[in-house]
Every structure is written in structure tokens, then in C-alpha cells.
Amino acid sequence: MSIVSRSAVLFALLVALFVPAGASASPLFYYLDPRQIDLTALLPPPPDVSSAQERADEEQVAAAVMRRSPAQLYHAEEDSMRTVFFFSKSIGPGFDSARLPLTTRFFSHVRSDVEHLIDQAKTYWERPRPSGAHKARGSYPSGHAAFAAATAILLSQVMPSKRDAIFGQARMFAENRILLGVHYPSDVAAGWTAGTIAAYAMMHDRAFQHDFADVDAELHRASL
């Protein structure tokens, strides 16, 4: 079972704790009310520094970095931008920002909401990054994995025929963070769960529902 697949089991337990509310009450958020979701209560804490899980995390990162080829490293770095149009490989060449302004705007809001939600958890836990990773923000949970999960869930709602390809690409995007040596496996699993929770919460927001309907219509007009 992959890292992101295991996180789905955790989500099934967490979702019962989530109580949807109305529109966002924070100017930082478009579709989420941060009072709804406390990731520090919903996610397990990162592994203790002296634990067997921490050692396993470190070993998996070291092994991934050692085994990666120059081509794998190049593609992982090239594909690390958090944009919905990363999925053009799964959807097709017509899936680009120039043709899809409503989709561009909507998913930029989704990205912003997920980033702010993840930042709160990163600040709380302040887990150091893997050795050699030069990143200012904490390691846990992974913002890239959260973005990948949330975006894949939402995009597959309007493109169900491409669901398998979308999720396959999202998993690769998330797990590339380990290959790049900038996140631990537990960071990626927690990020995927956080993104799943965020997507579920957004679906209950009225502004989200209005904008998502516009995205659905735009993508259908584009015959994607």
C-alpha cells in the first residue's frame, strides 16, 4: 500500500470529526473557514525524534535520494510547481491557463486556502526538514502533498473519465517530495490526508459551489 493510499484510511476516521459550516469567516481564506479544521487535532503528530518511525523516515529519504537517477531528479524538479495545470499531462494539451480563466482563478484560490491551512500546522509542529534540505518552512505536513490531494479530488469531480490518470499523477507529484529529499514519508502521508480534508470541507462552502459550477461549465465548453 502506498503512502498516499494509507492516508486514505486515516481520513475515513477523521472525516466523522468534521462539522461543515457556512462561508469563510477569515479574509485569508476563500472557501474554508479555519475554525472548522484544526489539523493539529486531526492529524497525528510527526514522529518523535528518537522513535523507530523517525529512523525509518530518515532511511527512506536517504534511500530515495541515493537511488534516483539524474532524469528522475530533473523531472521531479521540473514538475514541482503547485498549479492545477501540472495535470495537463493527464488531461491533454488544451488544459492550459490561457484557455481557462475561470479554472485558473478557482484553483489559485484552492491552492491559497490549502497553503494557509498547512502553514498553521507547520508553524505548530515546526518539524525540521530532512538533512540537506534548504527550506525555510517546517516539514510536517507536506504542502505539496496536500495541494496534490485536494486538486486531484476536485478535478476528478468534473473529469471522472480521467480520474485514474489524475490521481496517478497526483500521487507521483506528492511522493516526488521524498525523492527530492525535501520531505519525509510521514510528511507526505499527513499532507495527503490534510488535502483530502480540505477538499471535503470546501465542497460545503456556498462560494465554492458557485465557482465550481463555473469551472465545470468552462471545462465542458472546452471539450476536455
Question: Whereabouts are the PLM-identified features?
Answer:
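Hydrophobic alpha-helical bundle signature of multipass membrane enzymes
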Residues: S26-L180, T193, A222
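Polar helix-capping/helix-linker motif
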Residues: R6, S51-A52, D205-F208
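Bacterial N-terminal signal peptides that target proteins for export
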Residues: M1-F11
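Non-catalytic nucleic-acid-binding interfaces of large nucleic-acid enzymes and RNP effectors
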Residues: A12, A16
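Primarily interfacial, aromatic-capped hydrophobic alpha-helices that serve as membrane anchors
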Residues: D214-L224
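Interfacial helix-loop-helix junctions of multi-pass membrane proteins
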Residues: M172-H210
